[in-house]
């Protein structure tokens, strides 16, 4: 009972600390679309199909279905830009920024042509977005990272971005399994000691506050165009 009460208190604190006044899907880009040149900074979320990106974004934004979720892998086939708290500067509110949902990769039944298009779309975004400040790589905490996860992590590093790994679906594991699973992710991605892994659950909202802290922290990082050599 005490654990439940502590969890409820943590959820209430996260909501108080990172209130959402406004959240809208502002831009949707396909493979041939021109990427927007946003003034507000961007943080991106990458991960394989069905890893829980849409659920995570909805949890961050305290919305049930702004980011469309589906049990069918490969649902997100575009780059989706969510504008958060436009011109908001008050304490206690989430910062004015964009959350960028990248297409899920590794969808087994997608054609080779479709997979290549998604790959080019993601790579182009990572390489060219001047507003991008941080990339969150989502990995299912229940499974070892896949070859696609490793390739995605390498893309992020090569683009000059700092990566943070989010271990999704933490509520699906027993507490005794958590440490072993996190070590499996760190080893599987060959992460350095400084690379952060955030356990996250869309069911309990655990990790919401930690992710928002890192999103806010990203606003003060070095200009992404300098990091990428532009």
Residue ranges and their predicted role:
Residues 75, 87, 97, 104-106, ...:
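Conserved nucleotide-binding/hydrolysis micro-motifs of P-loop NTPases
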